[in-house]
């Protein structure tokens, strides 16, 4: 049950991140090394790729957890997969918070 709640919470966080990117219409920037993107990709496209990657990691961790419950996967693999997914989610949340913070700071600037 805890895993179900966490996966729903993670999906909600990812959807809020995607909505934030879509609503704010952030400009273009070069892609970070961790996320492969086409040259000249917009910042929004890079973030969309990142959210897709985080979503895949969360789904893989959930699948590994289910296999671990069934006894088909070693505990070490389950813990590793869940920790990797948690790290990715925390990174996505931190990036979302920084984007919102930057937007609010820009919106407070005098014209």
Swiss-Prot record:
Cellular location of this protein? Bacterial flagellum basal body
Location, primary (coarse class): other
Keyword set includes Acyltransferase? no
Which biological process terms from the Gene Ontology are attached to this UniProt entry? Answer: bacterial-type flagellum-dependent cell motility
Q: Which UniProt keywords apply?
A: Bacterial flagellum
Q: Which GO terms describe its molecular function?
A: cytoskeletal motor activity; structural molecule activity
An example Gene Ontology cellular component term from the record?
A: bacterial-type flagellum basal body
| A Pfam family annotated for this UniProt entry | FliE
Q: Does the keyword rRNA processing apply?
A: no
Stored InterPro entries: FliE
Q: Which segments does the entry list as coiled coil? A: none
Q: Which domain of life does the UniProt lineage start with? A: Bacteria
Give the family, as the similarity comment puts it. Answer: Belongs to the FliE family.
Record's protein name = Flagellar hook-basal body complex protein FliE
Highest lineage ranks of the organism? Bacteria, Pseudomonadati, Pseudomonadota, Alphaproteobacteria, Hyphomicrobiales
Q: Which gene encodes it?
A: fliE
